[in-house]
Curated annotation (Swiss-Prot):
Gene3D superfamilies: NusB-like. Keywords: RNA-binding, Transcription, Transcription antitermination, Transcription regulation. GO terms for biological process: DNA-templated transcription termination; transcription antitermination. Involved in transcription antitermination. Required for transcription of ribosomal RNA (rRNA) genes. Binds specifically to the boxA antiterminator sequence of the ribosomal RNA (rrn) operons. This is Transcription antitermination protein NusB. Disulfide bonds: none annotated. The keyword Protein biosynthesis does not apply. It comes from Latilactobacillus sakei subsp. sakei (strain 23K).
Length: 142
């Protein structure tokens, strides 16, 4: 099994959640393998990869607690805005960051916030990164 650091696991969590959002008929295990075996793209036969426990924790946590996460995030949107108006990558990063901030015993809230901003830097634009920082920082202060 490849060794994944926490940052790579968070990237994979984002990618799995994004994949599931885009293709809701996809099985969770298939989404994991699609993301975790990307480096085997050219291989004739793909070798399945064991899903790291922290990745499963993040993905299952976000999917199982999506309604509660959305309810917690909604008050921090601009007046008249709804989560459905947000770009999907931004919403997924917000959910992932908030879940980790509230539920991980391994990453302090400030670390989870910083990691969410790293994901935003990689998967969104500067304006979205500022928005994500503004929303999630409210939960660090709380």
């Amino acid at each position: 099994m490849p060794n994944f650091n926490r940052h790579q696991i968070r990237q994979a969590a984002f990618q799995v959640l994004f994949t599931l959002n885009a293709n809701q008929s996809l099985e969770l295990e298939d989404a994991y393998q699609a993301v975790l075996t990307m480096d085997q793209f050219d291989a004739e036969e793909v070798t399945p990869v064991e899903v790291p426990a922290y990745l499963a924790f993040l993905v299952s946590g976000v999917t199982e607690n999506q309604a509660a996460l959305d309810a917690a995030l909604t008050p921090y949107l601009k007046k008249g805005w709804q989560l459905s108006r947000l770009a999907k990558p931004d919403l997924i990063i917000l959910r992932l960051g908030l879940f980790e901030m509230q539920n991980s015993t391994e990453a302090p809230a400030k670390v989870a916030l910083n990691e969410a901003l790293e994901l935003a830097k990689q998967f969104t634009d500067d304006q979205a990164k500022g928005f994500i920082n503004g929303v999630l920082s409210k939960f660090v202060e709380a």
